């Protein structure tokens, strides 16, 4: 199996694994808890997306990554982390704008994923990623599943509870 196939297989298994965890434990918990508390829980992991800045650090990567991938991925993750922090703060403060901030963060963060995955597959090879290889195989599946859960909550539960 070539290295790109290994990467894609790893990401797929990660998404399936986090999906199983979501179905068995997270979704039942979300249904049993207040809407804003659930959104806060799902938003917290995204605050740590600043780790994507490591795509810009040679030494963490085996060689400098193609800037057509590294730059938008790194700064897209930083923006997503800041937006997640704003949304989380609004949720914890029970701001009347908290759901709006969650929508903004979730749309921007999900769009960043689409761009980063597309650019990553196009311009970066797994062997160049060095230690950052663990971002797409561990963090991305968790964050992808949590984005989907946030969209699910915003679309289905928000109508019932606000």
Predicted regions and their residues:
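Juxtamembrane "helix-exit" motif on the non-cytosolic side of transmembrane helices
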Residues: 24-28, 55-64, 118-126
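A generic, lipid-embedded transmembrane alpha helix
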Residues: 44-59
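Hydrophobic alpha-helical membrane segments
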Residues: 76, 80-84, 101-121, 140-143
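Non-cytosolic membrane-interface motifs at loop->transmembrane helix junctions
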Residues: 64-75, 101, 126-138
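Hydrophobic transmembrane alpha-helical segments in integral membrane proteins
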Residues: 1-18
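Membrane-interface helix-boundary motifs at transmembrane edges
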Residues: 26-39, 92-100, 158-162
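Alpha-helical transmembrane segments in multipass membrane proteins, preferentially the mid-helix core
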Residues: 79-94, 149-153
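Small-residue-rich transmembrane alpha-helices that serve as helix-helix interface/gating elements
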Residues: 10-14, 131-147
């Amino acid at each position: 199996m070539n290295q790109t196939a290994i990467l894609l297989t790893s990401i797929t298994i990660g998404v399936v694994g986090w999906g199983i965890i979501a179905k068995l434990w997270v979704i039942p918990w979300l249904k049993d808890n207040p809407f804003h508390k659930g959104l806060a829980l799902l938003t917290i992991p995204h605050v740590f997306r600043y780790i994507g800045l490591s795509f810009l650090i040679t030494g963490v990567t085996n060689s400098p990554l193609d800037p057509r991938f590294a730059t938008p991925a790194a700064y897209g993750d930083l923006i997503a982390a800041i937006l997640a922090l704003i949304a989380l703060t609004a949720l914890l403060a029970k701001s009347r704008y908290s759901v709006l901030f969650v929508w903004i963060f979730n749309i921007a963060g999900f769009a960043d994923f689409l761009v980063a995955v597309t650019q990553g597959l196009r311009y970066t090879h797994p062997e160049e990623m060095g230690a950052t290889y663990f971002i797409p195989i561990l963090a991305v599946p968790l964050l992808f599943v949590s984005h989907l859960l946030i969209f699910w909550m915003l679309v289905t539960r928000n109508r019932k509870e606000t």
